Regions:
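An anion-binding catalytic pocket shared by soluble metabolic enzymes
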Residues: 39-120, 136
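Short acidic/polar active-site loop segments enriched in Thr and Asp
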Residues: 33
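Contiguous alpha-helical scaffold segments within structured protein domains
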Residues: 1-14, 18-21, 25, 43-44, ...
Length: 180
């Protein structure tokens, strides 16, 4: 696909890298349990949102999303499944810990820091689901999800909507997860 962008703004790269270093230091010093550092990239110009979503589809193990107004659109892809439902059955996924492709998977499985980080996200999602009125029935075993450039540790969490619970209640309770 091709698109023409008249300007791509990523003025925050240096700030992002500085913040990432500070976040790592805070985790290592046990001042925080988990930090996710993000940056905003703004593209101005003629880009067709559908083409962008199609390009994101090249990575099959992600959830794609998008919405638009008459003037703006927001599209993205994430390895995290926030919530899916079928009738009263619901599923979410705890996605935490990232390892670059090509690195040894034992690093991911044997790291005490990574196990703590992943367990933190699992507990947070479990608590959010129950706090919103879902009945959690199963927390699966962590598995490795391989994407084109990275791998993530993923744990499925299954449950059932309570009698008076709507799936939108779960969305409100889950977003943002500690993985976001």
């Amino acid at each position: 696909w091709s698109a023409t962008a008249t300007r791509v703004s990523d003025d925050g790269r240096a700030r992002f890298l500085r913040t990432a270093r500070e976040a790592v230091a805070s985790v290592e010093a046990h001042r925080v349990d988990k930090v996710v550092v993000v940056r905003r990239v703004v593209v101005e110009g003629a880009i067709e949102p559908r083409q962008l979503l199609d390009a994101l589809a090249e990575e099959s193990s992600v959830t794609r999303f998008g919405f638009s107004t008459s003037e703006h659109c927001f599209v993205g892809a994430t390895p995290e499944l926030l919530v899916a439902w079928d009738g009263r059955l619901v599923r979410s996924e705890a996605v935490a810990v990232t390892l670059a492709r090509g690195r040894d998977l034992r690093e991911l499985r044997e790291s005490a820091k990574d196990r703590r980080e992943h367990a933190y996200v699992v507990r947070a999602i479990h608590a959010a689901l129950e706090g919103a009125g879902a009945i959690v029935s199963a927390v699966g075993e962590p598995e490795i999800r391989s994407l084109r450039h990275v791998r993530h540790w993923v744990t499925p969490i299954d449950g059932r909507l309570g009698a008076d619970v709507h799936v939108l209640d779960l969305l409100r309770a889950l977003h943002p997860t500690p993985a976001v």
